[in-house]
Amino acid sequence: MGSRALLLLKATTAETLLFTSKSTFSKALIRNSTRSFSTRSALLPPDLPRLAETARISLTPHEVEEFAPKIRQVIDWFGQLQAVDLQSIEPSIRADTEGDNLRDDSPETFENREAIIAAIPSYEEPYLKVPKVLNKD
């Protein structure tokens, strides 16, 4: 049995079942999900074991049970933010404002180019090759 199956066996509450992507409860919740702005958010919590794997941390089944309600609470806070009516408020910062403050994307030459090349593990003209950071397939 994999770790997901083990979590399903240990899951005793509906809250815990939300965090297992294989559960029929979470699939039914996804299918029947509607947007409502109550104190409970309509946003679904993430698959906690997968989130931990992506963050490169290991969680015990006890920690999954401990963090599940805390993550649910954070998601509920986001639901409360979504319920705020912002139609009458003028935005102060917008993505489409004029006046780009970005510099021109132009190549630069460095005075000590050879020192940079000597400091990296692999060099293939004109690229500096570095080791893989994420080993996802």
Curated annotation (Swiss-Prot):
SUBUNIT field: Subunit of the heterotrimeric GatCAB amidotransferase (AdT) complex, composed of A, B and C subunits.
Reactions catalysed, as given in the entry: L-glutamyl-tRNA(Gln) + L-glutamine + ATP + H2O = L-glutaminyl-tRNA(Gln) + L-glutamate + ADP + phosphate + H(+)
Single Gene Ontology MF annotation: glutaminyl-tRNA synthase (glutamine-hydrolyzing) activity
Family: Belongs to the GatC family.
GO biological process, one term: regulation of translational fidelity
Note: This protein may be expected to contain an N-terminal transit peptide but none has been predicted.
Keyword Ubl conjugation included in the entry's annotation: no
Enzyme Commission code(s) on record: 6.3.5.-
Entry's localization field: Mitochondrion; Plastid, Chloroplast
UniProt entry keywords in alphabetical sequence: ATP-binding, Chloroplast, Ligase, Mitochondrion, Nucleotide-binding, Plastid, Protein biosynthesis
Species name: Vitis vinifera
Name of the molecule in the record: Glutamyl-tRNA(Gln) amidotransferase subunit C, chloroplastic/mitochondrial
Domain of life from the UniProt record: Eukaryota
UniProt function note: Allows the formation of correctly charged Gln-tRNA(Gln) through the transamidation of misacylated Glu-tRNA(Gln) in chloroplasts and mitochondria. The reaction takes place in the presence of glutamine and ATP through an activated gamma-phospho-Glu-tRNA(Gln).
HAMAP family: GatC (MF_00122)
Gene assigned in the entry: GATC
Enzyme type, top EC level: ligase
A GO cellular component entry from the record: glutamyl-tRNA(Gln) amidotransferase complex
InterPro entries according to UniProt: Asp/Glu-ADT_sf_sub_c (IPR036113), GatC (IPR003837)
